Structure formats: structure tokens, C-alpha cells
């Protein structure tokens, strides 16, 4: 009988994939997973299982393992730390060698790191809390089409947050009435108006008609105000070809910005669109529809900061990032954590803000965070203070819900933001005097 090469059967992952002595390399992609194992599964085994299944491992030793260098290609669980206040949870840190990932592909990055392990039997729940993207990998991405500085230069708007408004009712308006609402908001003083994320091309309003009427509204408002205006024309579609067709038509109309739903549209489509936008001078607004399906559970899924980093690599000039206002204090620090990850070049590790790794983006352009959803003019002082100048504040109902109509609603928001910025620049405390500032401005 043939001599036995190795023993068949199920093998403990930790023998190969748990390596506490490992020194991480500057080129490694690092991940922090919140792991909740099944009862009886030791932390080292669960952490190693995650490292194995998201890199080179399978449940047994295979002959072809001998044809490669596992040491060079395997993911490694290099550290495990308990989670305060949680008996059965811990953070597993995993290092992945750079060569496991295709250059310039967020799609491949996610397929590898979160593609398979989340259904793993030995785990009750698994959440990816953060990723460290090394410059060696981030440099293979184009990133945002233009970034914050280029956008300000294109729009000629400096020293204040930009203002937007989602056109409501989001479904049911005809293209002409929709265009009229766009015109009224832009004419009143907003910088942008927005297609809702689910406005694509429905029977009551086909995309081409909407694009034409919105372009007319933009041109009219620009001519009357002397300011550069935009409307986020949603190019999201059922196929990549159709999406590109819409983006190309937007460029032909001469509008400054288009929009995409990056999670429902997918990273591959989003990256293609981002490349087109840079090549053709279009800004790209990104909506995060479907994010809560992935990021809402505290112990399973992915934190939004990971989706935000992925978007910065895939490409977008704006991305929705929550509002903070009216929520808990802790939420504020965590939100500002990923807002910094979107805007800044270098972000220090800071666990109090949920940032598990120091992230160096080198020279990748930044993304403007968009605060949107249930905010109105009385939130303006808080929003100005929390988000600072490099942000887009979007008031849908907070503009169109004004008792006097759309244009007065837009005027109210513009007056409020300028009053808040001026008060802040004069050294007034917006947290304390915010309401007073708004009252004075409204006279």
C-alpha cells in the first residue's frame, strides 16, 4: 500500500493560523473582527478559523498545500483581546499578506475578507470593526474622482458647509414638476438638490426626461444667482452599461455632478463610474442605501467605517455619513471617527472613537461627508460645530416643508448656515448660543 503522506481528518485551525508572535508588516492588510464563538470554542481557535477561512485555509490538509508556501500567503490571527463587559466576545486581529488581493479591486478585497467567514458554524456572530489599508495597497486605487479641494475650486465656494436638499415626494412627481422644485430650491440659495436614492427610471418619470428638466432648472438658477449650482442626477441603473449611458448623457448636458447608490449598485459598477467621472470632470455623489442591512447589528456584519474606507478607495466625492444630532454622545465620537477617515490624510488609532488602526491615506483625495435625514434649520448650529466646513448638509423635508414654500425654505437654510459660520468665526459658542444665533438671523 502507498505510504501515507499526511493524516486525513479535521485539523485545528489554531495550529497553523494562530501566531501571537507574528510582527505585522507595513504592507499587511490588518482587520479587527468582533468574534462571538459558539459555546465551547476557544478564542484562539475561533480567531484562527476566521484568519484561515478568509485566506488560504480549508477544513483539512490538502495535497496541494505542498505546492505553495502557506507561510507566505496565509492570513494570521496575531492578537486576541477581550471586549469589556462582554463574557463571550473578543476582538481578533488578523493580518493578511498583500499578495492575497487584486490591485485596485474593492470587490476582491471584500470577497476575500468578508466573503465566506460570516456563515461559519463555529461562530455565533462576527463583525468586521475596522480595516487597516496599507499605502502599498491604497496606491493601487484611483480613489475619489476629485476630492474636497478640487470640488471647492470647481464650485467656487469656500469657508462654509455646502447645502443640499432631497426633492420630495421622492416618488410620483412628473419630470417637469420635479424640475420646478429643483429650480426653486437652487434659486433660494442651496448649492445642490438631490435625486432620492430610489429615483432611477420609473414609469411616472423616465430618467432622460428628469435629466433634461433638471439641467434646465440648474441653468436658470445659475443665471439668476451668479453661483454654480448642481443637482445629483442618479445614474444608478440595472446594468453597468445603462449606468454609464446615464452618466454620459449628464456630461453632455453640462451638469457638474452625478450620483450613485454604491452598495446596491455594487463596488465594481461604482469604481467604473468613479473612473469615468474623473476622466470627464464630473463630481460623484454617493448614497449608502442598504448600509444598515450590513452595519446595524452591533455584533454581526460590518461597521460603517469599513464601508466608508471602501468607498474612499472605490471612489466618490460625497458620501452619506449619518447626522449625529439628537443621538447619544458616544455615537458622536464614533461618527466623527469615520468622518475623519473620509476627509483626512492621516488618522491616528483611537479606540474611544472606534478607530482600531492608524490609517495613512498618503495623498488620496478626501470625501465630503453628507449629513442627511430628519435634520432642519434648528439643527444648523450643532451640525456646523460637529461637521465643520468640509461637509454637505442636506435638508429634504427641512427645506420643502417650509410653510411658505420651497424657495423660502432654501433661503432659511442658507441664511442659517451663513449666520452659524459667522458666529463661529467670531468666537461665539454655537452649542450654547445656537438658537439665539438663528433667531437673530431670521429677523
Swiss-Prot record:
Q: Which Gene3D superfamilies match?
A: Ribulose bisphosphate carboxylase, large subunit, C-terminal domain, RuBisCO large subunit, N-terminal domain
**Known post-translational modifications?**
The disulfide bond which can form in the large chain dimeric partners within the hexadecamer appears to be associated with oxidative stress and protein turnover.
List other remarks: The basic functional RuBisCO is composed of a large chain homodimer in a 'head-to-tail' conformation. In form I RuBisCO this homodimer is arranged in a barrel-like tetramer with the small subunits forming a tetrameric 'cap' on each end of the 'barrel'.
Official protein name in the record: Ribulose bisphosphate carboxylase large chain
- What role is this protein assigned? RuBisCO catalyzes two reactions: the carboxylation of D-ribulose 1,5-bisphosphate, the primary event in carbon dioxide fixation, as well as the oxidative fragmentation of the pentose substrate in the photorespiration process. Both reactions occur simultaneously and in competition at the same active site.
Signal peptide range: none
Q: Does the keyword Chloroplast apply?
A: yes
Family stated for the protein in its record: Belongs to the RuBisCO large chain family. Type I subfamily.
Q: What keyword terms does UniProt attach to this protein?
A: Calvin cycle, Carbon dioxide fixation, Chloroplast, Disulfide bond, Lyase, Magnesium, Metal-binding, Methylation, Monooxygenase, Oxidoreductase, Photorespiration, Photosynthesis, Plastid
Q: Which residues carry this modification: N6-carboxylysine?
A: 194
User: What Gene Ontology molecular function terms does this protein carry?
Assistant: magnesium ion binding; monooxygenase activity; ribulose-bisphosphate carboxylase activity
Which amino acids does the record list as binding Mg(2+)?
194, 196-197
| Catalytically driven reaction(s) | 2 (2R)-3-phosphoglycerate + 2 H(+) = D-ribulose 1,5-bisphosphate + CO2 + H2O; D-ribulose 1,5-bisphosphate + O2 = 2-phosphoglycolate + (2R)-3-phosphoglycerate + 2 H(+)
Q: Which residues carry this modification: N6,N6,N6-trimethyllysine?
A: 7
What EC number(s) would the UniProt record show? 4.1.1.39
Would you say which domain of life the source belongs to?
Eukaryota
- Give the record's subunit note: Heterohexadecamer of 8 large chains and 8 small chains; disulfide-linked. The disulfide link is formed within the large subunit homodimers.
Q: What start-end ranges are recorded for coiled-coil regions in this protein?
A: none
Among SUPFAM superfamilies, the record links this protein to:
RuBisCo, C-terminal domain, RuBisCO, large subunit, small (N-terminal) domain
Where in the cell? Plastid, Chloroplast
Q: What class of enzyme is it?
A: lyase
Q: Name one GO cellular component term.
A: chloroplast
